[in-house]
Protein backbone atom coordinates (compact mmCIF):
# COMPACT_ATOMS: atom_id res chain seq x y z
CA UNK A 1 0.00 0.00 0.00
CA UNK A 2 2.87 2.35 0.74
CA UNK A 3 4.33 1.88 -2.74
CA UNK A 4 0.93 2.47 -4.34
CA UNK A 5 0.43 5.67 -2.34
CA UNK A 6 3.86 6.93 -3.41
CA UNK A 7 3.14 6.08 -7.05
CA UNK A 8 -0.21 7.90 -6.90
CA UNK A 9 1.47 10.97 -5.39
CA UNK A 10 4.16 10.87 -8.07
CA UNK A 11 1.44 10.66 -10.73
CA UNK A 12 -0.32 13.61 -9.12
CA UNK A 13 2.86 15.70 -9.40
CA UNK A 14 3.22 14.45 -12.97
CA UNK A 15 -0.14 15.98 -13.84
CA UNK A 16 0.41 19.15 -11.83
CA UNK A 17 3.56 19.86 -13.83
CA UNK A 18 1.89 18.81 -17.08
CA UNK A 19 -1.34 20.80 -16.71
CA UNK A 20 -0.29 23.96 -14.89
CA UNK A 21 0.72 25.62 -18.12
CA UNK A 22 -2.90 25.80 -19.30
CA UNK A 23 -3.88 28.31 -16.63
CA UNK A 24 -0.71 30.33 -17.18
CA UNK A 25 -1.12 30.82 -20.94
CA UNK A 26 -2.66 34.32 -20.85
CA UNK A 27 0.29 35.68 -18.87
CA UNK A 28 2.79 33.84 -21.09
CA UNK A 29 1.10 35.22 -24.21
CA UNK A 30 1.27 38.72 -22.78
CA UNK A 31 4.94 38.51 -21.84
CA UNK A 32 6.26 36.81 -24.96
CA UNK A 33 3.73 38.16 -27.47
CA UNK A 34 3.10 34.80 -29.12
CA UNK A 35 0.10 33.62 -31.10
CA UNK A 36 -2.44 30.99 -30.13
CA UNK A 37 -0.75 28.63 -32.58
CA UNK A 38 2.54 28.91 -30.70
CA UNK A 39 0.76 28.49 -27.37
CA UNK A 40 -0.81 25.34 -28.83
CA UNK A 41 2.65 24.12 -29.77
CA UNK A 42 3.83 24.85 -26.24
CA UNK A 43 1.01 22.98 -24.51
CA UNK A 44 0.64 20.18 -27.04
CA UNK A 45 3.34 19.38 -29.53
CA UNK A 46 6.40 20.44 -27.53
CA UNK A 47 5.43 18.16 -24.68
CA UNK A 48 3.64 15.31 -26.45
CA UNK A 49 6.11 14.71 -29.26
CA UNK A 50 8.89 13.60 -26.95
CA UNK A 51 6.53 11.92 -24.51
CA UNK A 52 5.28 9.75 -27.37
CA UNK A 53 8.70 9.12 -28.92
CA UNK A 54 10.24 8.04 -25.61
CA UNK A 55 7.31 6.05 -24.20
CA UNK A 56 8.21 2.66 -25.69
CA UNK A 57 12.00 2.92 -25.22
CA UNK A 58 11.47 3.93 -21.58
CA UNK A 59 9.08 1.02 -21.10
CA UNK A 60 11.63 -1.40 -22.54
CA UNK A 61 14.31 0.08 -20.30
CA UNK A 62 12.01 -0.32 -17.29
CA UNK A 63 11.59 -4.01 -18.14
CA UNK A 64 15.33 -4.56 -17.71
CA UNK A 65 16.37 -2.09 -15.00
CA UNK A 66 15.40 -0.74 -11.60
CA UNK A 67 11.97 0.82 -12.03
CA UNK A 68 12.05 2.72 -8.75
CA UNK A 69 15.26 4.48 -9.74
CA UNK A 70 13.88 5.22 -13.20
CA UNK A 71 10.81 6.87 -11.68
CA UNK A 72 13.02 8.88 -9.31
CA UNK A 73 15.12 10.06 -12.26
CA UNK A 74 11.98 10.91 -14.23
CA UNK A 75 10.61 13.00 -11.34
CA UNK A 76 13.92 14.86 -11.06
CA UNK A 77 14.02 15.57 -14.80
CA UNK A 78 10.44 16.75 -15.22
CA UNK A 79 10.48 18.76 -11.99
CA UNK A 80 13.74 20.43 -12.92
CA UNK A 81 12.45 21.23 -16.38
CA UNK A 82 9.24 22.65 -14.92
CA UNK A 83 11.31 24.92 -12.69
CA UNK A 84 13.47 25.90 -15.68
CA UNK A 85 10.26 26.79 -17.52
CA UNK A 86 9.75 29.49 -14.93
CA UNK A 87 13.21 30.89 -15.65
CA UNK A 88 12.85 31.05 -19.43
CA UNK A 89 14.07 34.35 -20.88
CA UNK A 90 12.15 33.84 -24.12
CA UNK A 91 9.60 31.62 -25.79
CA UNK A 92 12.19 29.27 -27.33
CA UNK A 93 13.70 28.56 -23.92
CA UNK A 94 10.23 27.92 -22.52
CA UNK A 95 9.44 25.51 -25.37
CA UNK A 96 12.72 23.65 -24.84
CA UNK A 97 12.01 23.34 -21.13
CA UNK A 98 8.52 21.98 -21.87
CA UNK A 99 10.09 19.42 -24.20
CA UNK A 100 12.23 18.45 -21.21
CA UNK A 101 9.09 18.04 -19.11
CA UNK A 102 7.77 15.62 -21.74
CA UNK A 103 11.05 13.70 -21.74
CA UNK A 104 10.95 13.38 -17.96
CA UNK A 105 7.30 12.46 -17.73
CA UNK A 106 7.76 9.68 -20.28
CA UNK A 107 9.62 7.85 -17.51
CA UNK A 108 6.71 7.68 -15.08
CA UNK A 109 3.80 5.57 -16.28
CA UNK A 110 5.49 2.55 -17.88
CA UNK A 111 7.55 1.61 -14.81
CA UNK A 112 4.71 2.53 -12.44
CA UNK A 113 2.26 0.26 -14.26
CA UNK A 114 4.81 -2.52 -14.23
CA UNK A 115 5.40 -2.11 -10.48
CA UNK A 116 1.67 -2.17 -9.77
CA UNK A 117 1.31 -5.33 -11.86
CA UNK A 118 4.04 -6.98 -9.77
CA UNK A 119 2.65 -5.80 -6.43
CA UNK A 120 -1.00 -6.74 -6.94
CA UNK A 121 -2.57 -10.01 -8.08
CA UNK A 122 -4.94 -9.81 -11.06
CA UNK A 123 -8.05 -9.76 -8.87
CA UNK A 124 -6.81 -6.62 -7.04
CA UNK A 125 -4.98 -4.92 -9.87
CA UNK A 126 -7.92 -2.88 -11.20
CA UNK A 127 -8.49 -1.33 -7.79
CA UNK A 128 -4.78 -0.58 -7.48
CA UNK A 129 -4.77 1.06 -10.91
CA UNK A 130 -7.84 3.05 -9.88
CA UNK A 131 -6.00 4.35 -6.83
CA UNK A 132 -2.96 5.17 -8.95
CA UNK A 133 -4.99 7.08 -11.53
CA UNK A 134 -6.56 9.27 -8.84
CA UNK A 135 -3.29 11.14 -9.27
CA UNK A 136 -4.49 12.39 -12.67
CA UNK A 137 -7.57 14.23 -11.40
CA UNK A 138 -5.89 15.36 -8.19
CA UNK A 139 -2.96 16.72 -10.19
CA UNK A 140 -5.16 18.59 -12.66
CA UNK A 141 -7.22 20.07 -9.83
CA UNK A 142 -4.15 21.20 -7.90
CA UNK A 143 -2.47 22.56 -11.04
CA UNK A 144 -5.39 24.89 -11.68
CA UNK A 145 -5.95 25.83 -8.04
CA UNK A 146 -2.32 26.33 -7.10
CA UNK A 147 -1.21 27.63 -10.48
CA UNK A 148 -4.06 30.11 -10.72
CA UNK A 149 -3.57 31.41 -7.20
CA UNK A 150 0.21 31.77 -7.45
CA UNK A 151 0.04 33.30 -10.94
CA UNK A 152 -2.56 35.83 -9.84
CA UNK A 153 -0.78 36.79 -6.64
CA UNK A 154 2.89 36.46 -7.59
CA UNK A 155 3.34 35.60 -11.28
CA UNK A 156 3.36 32.80 -13.84
CA UNK A 157 7.08 32.16 -13.45
CA UNK A 158 6.75 31.68 -9.73
CA UNK A 159 3.89 29.22 -10.27
CA UNK A 160 6.20 27.04 -12.35
CA UNK A 161 8.99 27.36 -9.81
CA UNK A 162 6.66 26.41 -6.94
CA UNK A 163 5.46 23.22 -8.59
CA UNK A 164 8.82 22.37 -10.14
CA UNK A 165 11.01 22.59 -7.08
CA UNK A 166 9.43 20.24 -4.51
Residue ranges and their predicted role:
Residues 11, 44, 48, 75, ...:
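Small-residue-rich transmembrane alpha-helices and their cytosolic helix-loop interfaces
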Residues 158-166:
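Symmetry-related core transmembrane helices of the 12-TM Major Facilitator Superfamily/SLC fold
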Amino acid sequence: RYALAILAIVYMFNFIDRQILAILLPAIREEFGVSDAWLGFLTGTAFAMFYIILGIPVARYADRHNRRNLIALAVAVWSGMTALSGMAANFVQLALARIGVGVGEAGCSPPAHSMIADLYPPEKRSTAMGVYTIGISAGIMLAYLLGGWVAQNVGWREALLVVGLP
